[in-house]
């Protein structure tokens, strides 16, 4: 990621293969815990490799960065096709590195892809993997897509017992997963 960015270029097919295997930090909270002696090398390596902002975001993402298995994604696309969807504006509101874009069936390739990812590392990887997609690296609550713009929204929204601040939806007191569903439907 950093090599491509420092050289201001797209990722090669080999680099894309490597980058597409990134699955976030959801399964590695111990790597961010300095009190875990068995993880001390990984802890230090992360501190050395990541900027302060990247490190803080990666540590925070251990709470909800869980990626969707390809078989689930394929099944979701099969349902869409069975319902008659062929092309249109597709939103992935919490995209990680874009696994849903990577498994987009051939029959849906005429669609325009839009993605949103809060985590900087995941979002930057997604931009390298899918340069033709419109990807925003920010919280979903900070996007300003017009209502009724998307034909389909697909993905695996974050789940948790915490809320997102968005004036348009604050009155509903949604937990994060409910918020994502409500905003996506609008």
Where are these regions (language model features)?
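Class I S-adenosyl-L-methionine-dependent methyltransferase catalytic core
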Residues: 1-186
């Amino acid at each position: 990621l950093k090599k491509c960015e420092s050289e201001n270029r797209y990722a090669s097919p080999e680099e894309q293969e490597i980058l597409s295997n990134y699955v976030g930090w959801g399964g590695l909270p111990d790597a961010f815990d300095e009190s875990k002696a068995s993880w001390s090398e990984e802890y230090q390596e992360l501190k050395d490799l990541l900027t302060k902002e990247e490190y803080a975001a990666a540590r925070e993402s251990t709470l909800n960065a869980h990626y969707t298995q390809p078989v689930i994604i394929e099944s979701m696309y099969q349902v869409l096709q069975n319902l008659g969807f062929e092309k249109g504006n597709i939103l992935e509101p919490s995209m990680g590195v874009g696994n849903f874009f990577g498994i987009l069936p051939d029959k849906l390739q005429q669609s325009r892809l839009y993605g949103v990812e809060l985590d900087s590392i995941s979002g930057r990887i997604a931009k390298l993997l899918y340069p033709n997609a419109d990807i925003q690296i920010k919280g979903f609550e900070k996007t300003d897509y017009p209502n009724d713009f998307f034909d389909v929204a697909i993905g695996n929204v974050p789940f948790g017992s915490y809320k997102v601040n968005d004036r348009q939806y604050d009155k509903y007191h949604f937990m994060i997963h409910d918020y994502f569903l409500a905003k996506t439907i609008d």
